Amino acid sequence: MPLAAAQDLRAYNLQTASVARTGADLLRLLTAGFTAKAPSIEPIHAQLSAKWAGEPAAGKLIRAALVLCADHELNASTFTVRCVASTRATPYGAVMAGLAALQGPRHGGQTARVAALFDEVAAADSPEAAVAARMRRGERLPGFGHILYPDGDPRCQLLRRLLTTALGSNPELAMAVELAAAATENTGLQPNVDFSLVMLQRSLNLPETAPMGIFAIGRCAGWIAHAQEQYAHPELIRPRARYVGEQPQLARD
């Protein structure tokens, strides 16, 4: 991406139409990174499905997941993108900053921890046993709970319904449903979007990189829209901070 940014002089044009063109190029480039193919104008969900899946229903399900990941107001990565865009960095710079934030284990990188939990469940006697083992060790259950959705993440709920309708009796999906039920019963926490992306990956037998790939590509579309909006405002995003630590000792003669 840095190499493409250096060669794309149009990216320095921050007018709305130009940012839209650059954003489309960025989405194709990011998709190419996950498909290991040249950038293409084919629909993104079709590219990912052709590379990743053999399941006929995969394309529509991947498309739904991309849409569900596209925007979620001012999460950490999107706020980062808007801050960078406010400096008048190019869309490449804004998106690369967003990707850096997204990969953190408390953001999109959480999907790797959810995948590890799924592996534990697959190796355990039952989902309940895996949940109990985590709880006895005093460990969190990744993929559960969201500060905005104490009653359940609607993105996860929708993707689960779509998977159930499309796949019916799928063993990986059944395991995910049992895991969610066991975790919610014992913690009161509902599964979130990170859980649903791993549930999708396991149910469709997609590669391990798929959850993060879908999250990053889907969210990139939202980042471009946020950057477009930010470029239209002249203000630099500059929050203030107030020092609340110990006061330095005054020097004595």
Predicted regions and their residues:
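Hydrophobic alpha-helical bundle cores within soluble ligand-binding/oligomerization subdomains
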Residues: 1-253
